[in-house]
Design a protein with these regions (language model features):
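Conserved glycine-bearing catalytic or ligand-binding loops at nucleotide- and phosphate-handling centers
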Residues: 3-20
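Thiamine diphosphate
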Residues: 19-192
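Active-site core segments that coordinate phosphate-bearing ligands/cofactors
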Residues: 1-5, 39-40
Length: 192
């Protein structure tokens, strides 16, 4: 089960699905416009179940699944400016889970925030269950999951809907600050 963060990743996922012959495979086809990235001349398939690190940081791991990656990058920039260094990772796969990536992120950070366009019981819950089964939560590692709430969201502009759902950069920043007990009024948060 794959979820693309942008049009290049979507192309790679389509190629992966076309070449995969060992069972069922699926990917989420995102709604809306592409980001306008320059497409490579040659599209390569993905290694099944492997995510990627987009940016390395030290304190916070932002683990994204799907198209919220640009909001994750904006949140990372804001948090970095506050002295809260962030790693950004693109999970790419909800299943199979990249357990090596998750282990590395949990070992090298104080907090992990998962961001997905799924509902409760989805990718974030899968990550949380893995961390619990491995005993990683026993030593105080912190994790928060951001996902679509189980409420009716009024149809409209996609950015407004994501803001209402709490899947925007501002809410990612607020979630991090709340975990660390930082009063957001101490910082000027620039809205994106």
């Amino acid at each position: 089960v794959m979820a693309a963060s942008n049009e290049i990743e979507l192309s790679r996922m389509v190629k992966t699905a076309a070449e995969y012959n060992s069972g069922p495979i699926s990917f989420r086809y995102p709604r809306g416009n592409a980001f306008g990235l320059d497409m490579p001349e040659r599209i390569e398939a993905l290694k099944i179940g492997k995510g990627k690190i987009i940016k390395k940081g030290e304190k916070i791991a932002l683990l994204n699944l799907g198209t919220r990656i640009e909001e994750v990058k904006k949140a990372s920039d804001i948090l970095d400016s506050m002295g809260l260094s962030c790693t950004i990772a693109d999970a790419r796969f909800a299943k199979p889970l990249d357990t090596e990536l998750i282990k590395d992120l949990s070992k090298n950070h104080e907090l992990m925030i998962t961001i997905e366009e799924g509902s409760s019981g989805g990718f974030g819950a899968h990550v949380l269950m893995h961390l619990a089964e491995q005993g990683i939560l026993d030593d105080g590692f912190k994790i928060r999951n951001l996902y679509l709430p189980d409420i009716f969201i009024q149809q409209g502009d996609a950015s407004d809907m994501y803001a209402q759902a709490g899947l925007n950069s501002e809410n990612i920043v607020k979630t991090v600050l709340k975990v660390f007990g930082i009063n957001k009024s101490e910082f000027k948060i620039i809205k994106s």
